[in-house]
Amino acid sequence: KRQACGGSASSAASSAAVSEVASSAAASEEEETAAPLSATEPLRIAGLKGPTTMGLVNLLSMEQAGTAAMDYDLQLYGAADEIVPLLIKGELDMAAIPANLAATLYQKTSGGIQAVAVNTLGVLYVVEQGDTVHSTADLKGRTILSTGKGTTPEYVLRYLLTANGLDPDKDVDIQYYSEATEVTAQMASTQDAIAVLPQPYVTAAGLKDDTLRVALDLTAEWDKVADTQLITGVTVVRKAYAEEHPDVVAAFLADYAQSVNAANTDLDGTAALCEEQGVVAKAAIAKKALPNCNIVCLTGEELKADVSGYLQVLYDADPAAVGGTLPGEDFYWAAQ
């Protein structure tokens, strides 16, 4: 299993951007003169409530401690479709969004969006009240409550159902809700409910209702039928911003690697920040969920290999999942 970059057990294939920035930062510290960044305004970055933003929150404590390379304006949204227009209009510089949505946006903006990092691997689980689901095939004939129509949960679920011989449109009844909190509320009032939920909502639902059982880990199910990583989220940048401020993007990735490392090692501090920022309702939920959230910071060649492999699987299943065609080489940001 790969470690988040920036930690003591960093992957050997960690981004050149991060290592270059780290070494140049160390050199500039020795001289006590760090070159000013090309952008003076805070970096405007949006995230969704839940795992894709849990790796970002430590940027705020780093900023307060004076150890961040820049100031951050972290904005939180409930659904990805709230972020898209802001990114397109240039009212955001970066965003942490579902991987397939990043590919779709790349098509919509004629290459105006670039991926800079994978931020989250698999976080989806099937939960149920009872003990009836032990394989994907057991979902036949059932109603499944889920979030994420048009993003990762829908496409992962459809892919897994199809790979296990089920027709997603005929053999199951998938009901979509805009936010995970709606799914958990619906589960509480529905008998024999089955839901696809991401962490940390799996943990939150389990703490509220001890009859809930994690029936399937969809990452494990994915690994049985696909030879690529299951990727939940990527962090993207507007290409125009990246071209104007490549130094800021590289400095962000160095900060981000530290933030992700803290999310995986300082559970108490990260959990408190998650509650404070509204990323997760309660620190206790965040702390319990963090080890299961697969928060990473994969950049450079790892980013390209993992995301392109994942998008290929989605494309082969349904080209619409990635915006009709696979993104070109320029979709993957690399340090110049």
Regions found by a protein language model. Give the residues of each.
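Short, solvent-exposed loop/beta-turn-alpha elements that line the ligand-binding surface or hinge
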Residues: 63-71, 220-228, 295-304
